[in-house]
């Protein structure tokens, strides 16, 4: 019953008009009035911001802020996979041969997430990682590895929240929400970077348009907190053992190691 009521409330409030109004407000100078309160409530680290709080003219500018030069370092080990974002490490695990994985008691289909069987087949038997970005986090997304961009595509229309309630009661938000996917071929092995939209504010702006990408290079930004899902081919990586659910991650921090193949 709670799941049904939750979904009904989301469907009634999560329409195009609501999203449009919220987006317009966030991009308006009027939104600057609540910037100080927003920064206080979400405990934004102002020491890391590229500009002072009063220099951000709208909430949108604050959401998409850049960091000061040198505030993040990218792990330089050739075999490392790095966190593409600042965020909270939610979960990782195996992708079953049936191209599904379980998180928070909910089963997700890679076929649904990527839009078709052919794309999903690459990741059967592989590994998934999920990182959640709260409204307080730096919202820009960087590449976790170097390689050639093979595909960029967008799927989904509406978005359920990706917080605890959304994960429990929503309609598989990681694979059904509005999402932007970038696939990268790195030394013959594939990785999918799935950028999942948040409720009301679906906007995910792509910044990278070249055919190649370097580890740590900026690729996109969210206009609000959301979630990133990483998919890796079978036997491609080994997740850093020290990683724990709920752990804070910083952009550029090593999260996995590429496995050597003879």
Curated annotation (Swiss-Prot):
Compartments, record wording: Cell membrane
Coiled-coil ranges per UniProt: none
Catalytic reaction equation(s): a 1,2-diacyl-sn-glycero-3-phospho-L-serine + H(+) = a 1,2-diacyl-sn-glycero-3-phosphoethanolamine + CO2
Keyword DNA-binding tagged: no
Reported modifications of this chain: Is synthesized initially as an inactive proenzyme. Formation of the active enzyme involves a self-maturation process in which the active site pyruvoyl group is generated from an internal serine residue via an autocatalytic post-translational modification. Two non-identical subunits are generated from the proenzyme in this reaction, and the pyruvate is formed at the N-terminus of the alpha chain, which is derived from the carboxyl end of the proenzyme.
EC number: 4.1.1.65
Keywords in alphabetical order: Cell membrane, Decarboxylase, Lipid biosynthesis, Lipid metabolism, Lyase, Membrane, Phospholipid biosynthesis, Phospholipid metabolism, Pyruvate, Zymogen
Molecular function via GO: phosphatidylserine decarboxylase activity
Principal localisation: membrane
Site feature: Cleavage (non-hydrolytic): 225-226
One GO biological process term: phosphatidylethanolamine biosynthetic process
Disulfide bridge partners, by residue number: none
Entry note: cofactor: Binds 1 pyruvoyl group covalently per subunit.
Membrane topology: Peripheral membrane protein
One Gene Ontology term, aspect cellular component: plasma membrane
KW tRNA-binding (keyword) present: no
Cofactor(s) in the UniProt record: pyruvate
Post-translational modification Pyruvic acid (Ser), affected residues: 226
Residues the record marks as active site: 86, 142, 226
Family note: Belongs to the phosphatidylserine decarboxylase family. PSD-B subfamily. Prokaryotic type I sub-subfamily.
UniProt protein name: Phosphatidylserine decarboxylase proenzyme
Source organism per UniProt: Bacillus thuringiensis (strain Al Hakam)
């Amino acid at each position: 019953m709670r799941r049904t009521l939750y979904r009904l409330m989301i469907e009634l409030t999560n329409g195009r008009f609501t999203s449009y109004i919220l987006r317009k407000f966030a991009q308006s100078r009027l939104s600057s009035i609540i910037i100080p309160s927003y920064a206080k409530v979400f405990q934004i680290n102002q020491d890391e911001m590229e500009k002072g709080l009063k220099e951000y003219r709208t909430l949108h500018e604050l959401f998409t802020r850049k960091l000061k030069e040198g505030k993040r370092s990218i792990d330089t080990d050739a075999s490392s996979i790095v966190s593409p974002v600042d965020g909270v490490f939610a979960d990782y695990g195996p992708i079953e041969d049936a191209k599904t994985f379980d998180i928070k008691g909910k089963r997700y289909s890679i076929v649904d997430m990527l839009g078709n069987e052919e794309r999903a087949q690459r990741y059967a038997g592989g590994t998934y990682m999920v990182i959640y970005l709260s409204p307080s986090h730096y919202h820009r997304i960087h590449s976790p590895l170097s390689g050639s961009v093979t595909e960029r595509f967008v799927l989904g229309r509406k978005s359920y929240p990706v917080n605890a309630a959304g994960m429990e009661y929503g309609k598989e938000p990681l694979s059904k929400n509005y999402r932007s996917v970038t696939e990268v071929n790195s030394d013959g092995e594939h990785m999918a970077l799935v950028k999942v939209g948040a409720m009301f504010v679906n906007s995910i702006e792509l910044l990278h348009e070249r055919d190649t990408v370097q580890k740590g290079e900026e690729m996109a930004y969210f206009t609000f907190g959301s979630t990133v899902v990483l998919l890796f081919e079978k036997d491609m990586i080994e997740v850093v053992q020290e990683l724990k659910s709920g752990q804070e991650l910083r952009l550029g921090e090593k999260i996995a190691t590429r496995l050597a193949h003879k």
